[in-house]
């Protein structure tokens, strides 16, 4: 299916590009989430009329996320979990826990924006975690996990 992208989509394209994707991906994800429209002649004409407005909105959103990224960069999140004597946690620290703590600190971040390359944190200590605020803005933060004796 041919679609027009209304926003930048990772590994697919930028705003305004006409790309071909599988029907299910377009029908079930891109179109309902407002990231794309079918590439019909009427939709192409409508998009060209709104192109400048959409580009301004995308640039404003990017600038806002870059500003938030500068504030968030280098932040340390401190969490306490029950741990054994050897430093392994009885549970794990997930992106949900990190998101909740960042929100308490005044940085509203969704759990889907937190990238944990090695999966949930299962040991005590400092861990590097990435926060993807926008497709072009990713910030590294430090998560410090303290052990609490059970």
Swiss-Prot record:
Q: Which GO terms describe its molecular function?
A: rRNA binding; structural constituent of ribosome
Q: Origin, by domain of life?
A: Bacteria
Q: Which residues cross the membrane?
A: none
- Return one Gene Ontology term, BP aspect: translation
Q: Which GO terms describe its cellular component?
A: ribonucleoprotein complex; ribosome
> Does tRNA processing appear among the keywords?
no
Q: Which Gene3D superfamilies match?
A: Ribosomal protein L9, C-terminal domain, Ribosomal protein L9, N-terminal domain
Tell me the InterPro entries matching this sequence. Answer: Ribosomal_bL9, Ribosomal_bL9/RNase_H1_N, Ribosomal_bL9_bac/chp, Ribosomal_bL9_C, Ribosomal_bL9_C_sf, Ribosomal_bL9_N, Ribosomal_bL9_N_sf
Which keywords does the record carry?
Ribonucleoprotein, Ribosomal protein, RNA-binding, rRNA-binding
What is the documented function of this protein? Binds to the 23S rRNA.
Q: Which family does it belong to?
A: Belongs to the bacterial ribosomal protein bL9 family.
| HAMAP family, per the entry | Ribosomal_bL9
| The protein's name | Large ribosomal subunit protein bL9
Species assigned in the record: Polaromonas sp. (strain JS666 / ATCC BAA-500)
Name of the coding gene: rplI
